[in-house]
A protein has these predicted regions:
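A short, flexible beta-alpha/helix-coil linker loop
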Residues: 85-90, 184, 258-259
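N-terminal [4Fe-4S]-dependent radical SAM core
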Residues: 2-67
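Canonical Radical SAM [4Fe-4S] cluster-binding loop centered on the CxxxCxxC motif
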Residues: 61, 65-101
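Short, charge-rich binding segments
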Residues: 57-60, 71, 80, 112-113, ...
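Pocket-edge positions in alpha/beta enzyme catalytic cores
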Residues: 94-98, 126, 194
Length: 259
């Protein structure tokens, strides 16, 4: 995937989504809508940007992370989610699911190109809605990589239930749980399909996993807190310092994109 951007000074750049690198473009280089690495053609690209032999080497030999989208379904309907039906140009929460055979093929290809420790990230939608697939793909991946692979996913926490604890702990998953800072704000933004609040259920799930294995909870569960406005900071700070499930936790902060 390529993305063309222009700076405030009028300089043009090309972002290569495959390699996560940025190139400076000459003024006469044009990219048509929907262009890809294949449609642009490597010789054509090399006329306008720095030759990417180093990029090709990275793609072929230095794979480190594989992201697997398990499902487009989600059990929440966050008011700012770009996959909501209100955003007509984005995908919706469709019933599209992963092809397991294709996923295993891609994992094997990834294994052949990963020269060092590897990372598998399960993505959604809400990945825990496809927990059987997580189990199958995790076991398959471990049969290839042995001890060289680590697993992670981001979840809203609604389906982080007791029946999953043993498997997640045994396979040393790194789990990021997304919250909206504090209860009142969270429940106004992160609602269920039926329009109900979600904070109390998520806190209950976190409390259960902390009681089940406090070491895993402390070391392997990270909180991502969405900040919707600067005014939220005081309330978020209070929640972090008074909620026993959040005190001392690693918390990352993010801001939703505003139109």
């Amino acid at each position: 995937m390529y993305l063309e951007v222009e700076s405030n000074k009028g300089n043009r750049y090309l972002f290569d989504g495959l390699s996560n690198e940025i190139y400076s473009l000459k003024p006469d280089f044009k990219i048509t809508a929907g262009a890809s690495r294949n449609s642009l053609g490597l010789p054509n690209i090399e006329r306008f940007v720095t030759p990417d032999s180093q990029t090709e080497s990275k793609l072929n030999n230095l794979a480190k992370t594989l992201i697997i989208e398990l499902t487009e379904q989600c059990n929440l309907r966050c008011t700012y989610c770009v996959f909501d039906d209100a955003y007509s140009k984005e995908r919706s929460h469709s019933s599209t699911k992963l092809n397991i055979s294709l996923a295993k093929e891609k994992i094997y290809n990834f294994f052949c190109r990963a020269k060092e420790d590897a990372y598998i990230i399960f993505y959604g939608g809400e990945p825990l809605l496809e927990f059987k697939e997580i189990i199958e793909l995790t076991n398959y991946t471990k049969s290839l990589f042995s001890e060289r692979v680590k697993f992670s996913f981001t979840t809203n926490g609604m389906a982080l239930t007791e029946d999953k604890f043993d498997f997640l702990i045994e396979n040393d998953f790194l789990i990021t749980v997304s919250l909206d800072g504090f209860k009142k704000n969270h429940d106004s933004k992160r609602i269920t399909i039926n329009g109900n609040p979600s904070w109390d259920r998520i806190m209950s799930n976190l409390e259960k996993i902390k009681s089940y294995n406090s070491y895993f909870y402390d070391s392997k569960i990270i909180i991502n807190s969405v900040i919707n406005s600067i005014e939220d900071l005081e309330n978020i700070n209070y929640e972090i310092n008074h909620n026993l499930l959040l005190i001392g936790k690693e918390i990352r902060f993010s801001f939703p994109i505003q139109d």
